[in-house]
Amino acid sequence: MFLDAVPLEPYSTLKSQWSNKRIGRWRDRVAVPERETKQSMAAAALEVGARVRLAAGDFQHLLEALARRGYQVVGPTREDGQLIYGEIGKVADLPVGWTAVQEGGTFRLEPRPDQALFGYGVGQQSFKQFLWPPHQILWQVRREGGGWRLLPQAEEVPKFAFLGVRACELQAMAVQDRVFLQGVHVDPVYRGRREQAFIVALNCGHQDKGTCFCVSMGTGPKATTGFDLALTEVLQGEEHFFVVEVGTARGAEIIRQVPQRMADQQEIDAGDRVVAAMAGNMGRSLDPAGIKEALYANYEHPRWEEVAGRCLNCGNCTLVCPTCFCHTLEDAMDMAGTEGERRRRLDSCFTVDFSYLHGGSIRTSPKSRYRQWLTHKLATWIDQFGCSGCVGCGRCITWCPVGIDLTEEVRAIRETAAGAPKE
């Protein structure tokens, strides 16, 4: 039922001036110490599936290696007490030594007793905004003579390296690949950005259990596919290091430029224990078995009316969701009527106007709009795209102002299903 991430194709890259100089220095050496020889041989042998040890103190080298390849590194930063995805140029840009405590309608950052680089769960943003911009000009026209001329759109495709991509976010990208790349109409903006993106995944650990239920959805906490490199942060005693798994040839090319060595079995086991501990510490659970049929059979369940009485119809759940893609189109002209453009703007199915057709809106009640969102996310999405629209990240729970919990609503409907005593 769940869609695996689309494999990333290797792309050719030019050797940087730094790399050429470094190669020249190696060739000019008369003798190479035995330790360096072994390290270079191990680096040369790196291939997909290899796992290496990267000391936390050498993490800056990974950022620099990505920058040398022309990538704009984007990852979590701390801004105004929130986790925000922004440009990462140095390790200090990360929320080092912070953790995120979250529950329904609650999110706050608190200091940690250690210097973990990734000791927090997901914030309100996802990487969707970089692959599928919330505002986009689709085309522009100009009046010429007796007609209109379509103006070319020459957007320079940004080259992002996404840092700290959780397994649930990898699944969200795979879901959006199904929407924007594998349908009848391919989205050229999404395709260009997705093909360029370098993915540094992060296996979850060292964080508050929060509102996540990725284990229930089969999407985490360990990244299994769709990445160039995957990190597992290990803190044990005085040791602080990363076990880095190579996912693609591009990933191997980058990690070769970073001080590292092959991870031994004890280090690999330590990383596996971090992920296993996280898997056993989920904040929520949801049984996906038969969920589509349960929702279809309870379209008029009284729970829809009850949750509508709490829902503010603010659309927060759709804005923070890493897979929601509802949008609207707007046409605009200049005052002279000689130039115009069509814009795509992120929208929400919780707005009254979203379902507007000639004569009025179809979903006029909060009940109908919440039911549409939840049923689409967990049921009709499966019919439409062959996978669930929910990846279990828990953002919709955390960022709901009144703390509506998707997992609780589904459980309530199941426990009082059609034919059972009503609430």
Where are the regions that the model predicts?
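Iron-sulfur-associated redox domains of electron-transfer enzymes in respiratory
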Residues: 33-34, 38-296, 301-304, 335
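Extended amphipathic alpha-helical segments enriched in small hydrophobics
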Residues: 308-318
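Short, positively charged and aromatic/hydrophobic N-terminal segments
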Residues: 5, 11-13, 27-29
